[in-house]
UniProtKB/Swiss-Prot annotation:
It holds the Pfam family Radical_SAM. InterPro entries: Coproporphyrinogen-III_oxidase (IPR034505), Elp3/MiaA/NifB-like_rSAM (IPR006638), HemN_C (IPR010723), HemW-like (IPR004559), rSAM (IPR007197). Keywords: 4Fe-4S, Chaperone, Heme, Iron, Iron-sulfur, Metal-binding, Mitochondrion, S-adenosyl-L-methionine, Transit peptide. GO terms for molecular function: 4 iron, 4 sulfur cluster binding; coproporphyrinogen oxidase activity; metal ion binding. This is Radical S-adenosyl methionine domain-containing protein 1, mitochondrial. Belongs to the anaerobic coproporphyrinogen-III oxidase family. HemW subfamily. It comes from Dictyostelium discoideum (Social amoeba).
Length: 446
């Protein structure tokens, strides 16, 4: 859908900038609280307790969404059509958003419908909720989120189906609870995804992972979605500190590069053999209909509004005036991290912010064409479809691949079997995707 709309805009040579109103927008709602802090997680998270002010959090989320749309999107005349653009996906992430009161997200949904009257009916919007397998009274909780919030897709944080590895990962559920949660979710929803982490330590063998993965995909019964991640050691996490631990008891030794590569190859092979096609480095779906619309919008460099402590946003506008020559402009927004400070800022005064001026609450960063291009490569090359030239040219105001890329390096990487440059797109091969982080710096001209 995005590429078709972008193509139409380009063919019209930017005439009638209101074609942008057809570009989808995703809404990300961040709930920062968790019952336990996982040792590998570097997200903005805080320990859940009875001191969490649910009512204030609820009002703050709605107020921020309202403020973003009214004071940022609608502050400039050229963007006054923004309310006509559809919200196509909503993602309740965290943290652990299922710990929030259902009334909180009901209020968020009602605010969204008021601000975006041209959005699809709530039944047609992909609405995802992240849930932990050991959530109390899971079945009834999911029923209520489905009935009152409109959730139609569930993402389960399974992470492993081996009890000792769940303990290592700091998870609070066990294998039986993980299996039961998948069954409960599948009985209630047509769209269910769950996460697994592999390449955990040097001790994990190919055969162990093969058996676990096959077992997991059998639980999915050939229908749905799975996200299969390698364990990463992010700075600031407990696991990162344990990499350099001097004591054998706490030190973690990750698999070497060759072992990690072999585990990745096995993952892709086994998943596809069981009917799950890879469409992004870590994402596998049993059909096109099961692909995650929300994340696809990220990877295709669509617009998204992030509300909640630490949430990020991206906004694309078309400056319909002589000074800017009807050029595309893209902006980055980043929220305050700490929930208390975030709520205080939101509730202490009217937030006066402008999409083109940095604000003390919600700093706005205008992205250059080259920054947009780099972000498009980092996101788009994660996918099997790659980066479409038409989208790239549209988002960067006319840049082509040869203007932005080191074409000599591109040619070398093509010959080595890591990269494919076609007249209409740039994409990585299977071997190339394993080396994404090292390939990107090589092919950038600047």
């Amino acid at each position: 859908m995005i590429n078709k709309i972008v193509k139409n805009v380009i063919e019209n040579q930017f005439k009638g900038y209101n074609k942008l109103k057809d570009l989808p927008i995703s809404l990300f709602v961040y709930w920062p609280y968790c019952s336990k802090i996982c040792p590998y997680c570097n997200f903005n998270k805080y320990r859940d307790s009875d001191k969490v002010d649910h009512e204030r959090m609820s009002k703050s989320l709605s107020r921020e969404l309202e403020s973003f749309v009214k004071n940022i999107y609608l502050n400039s005349n050229e963007n006054s059509f923004i309310r006509e653009r559809p919200i196509t996906s909503i993602y309740f992430g965290g943290g652990t958003p299922s710990l929030a009161k259902i009334s909180t997200f009901v209020e968020t949904i009602e605010t969204m419908k008021k601000l975006f009257p041209s959005s699809l009916s709530i039944e047609d919007i992909e609405i995802t909720l992240e849930v932990n397998p050991d959530q109390k009274d899971l079945k009834n909780l999911l029923k209520d989120f489905k009935k009152y919030v409109g959730v139609n897709r569930v993402s389960l944080g399974v992470q492993s189906l081996v009890d000792k590895d769940l303990h290592f990962l700091g998870r609070t559920h066990n294998r039986i609870q993980a299996e039961e949660s998948i069954k409960i979710a599948r009985d209630l929803f047509d769209h269910v995804t769950f996460d697994l982490i592999y390449s955990r330590t040097i001790d994990q063998t190919l055969e162990q992972w093969r058996n676990e993965l096959r077992y997991a995909l059998n639980l999915a019964d050939g229908n749905g979605h799975v996200s299969l991640y390698t364990l990463t050691f992010e700075q600031g996490t407990s696991f990162y500190r344990r990499l350099s631990s001097k004591g054998n008891k706490f030190k973690i030794i990750p698999p070497d590069d060759q072992k990690s590569s072999d585990l990745y190859d096995l993952t892709v092979c086994e998943a596809e053999a069981m009917g799950f096609q890879q469409y992004e480095i870590s994402s596998f779906a049993s059909s096109h209909n099961q692909k995650g619309k929300h994340n696809l919008n990220y990877w295709r460099s669509g617009d998204f509004i992030g509300i909640g402590p630490g949430a990020s946003s991206r906004l694309t506008t078309l400056n319909n005036n002589n000074n800017n020559n009807n050029q595309i402009s893209r902006y980055s927004f980043k929220n305050i991290l700490h929930p208390k400070e975030w709520m205080e800022k939101l509730n202490s005064k009217e937030i006066l912010c402008n999409a083109f001026i940095e604000d003390e609450f919600n700093p706005t960063i205008p992205l250059t064409n080259f920054e947009v291009a780099e972000e498009m490569l980092l996101n788009g090359l994660r996918t099997i479809e790659g980066v479409q030239l038409s989208t790239f040219t549209f988002q960067t105001n006319g840049l082509t691949f040869d203007q932005f890329l080191n074409m000599k390096q591109v040619e070398i990487l093509q010959e080595q079997g890591f990269l494919i440059l076609e007249p209409t797109c740039l994409k990585l091969t299977g071997n190339g995707r394993k080396l994404l982080d090292t390939i990107i710096p090589k092919i950038l001209k600047y």
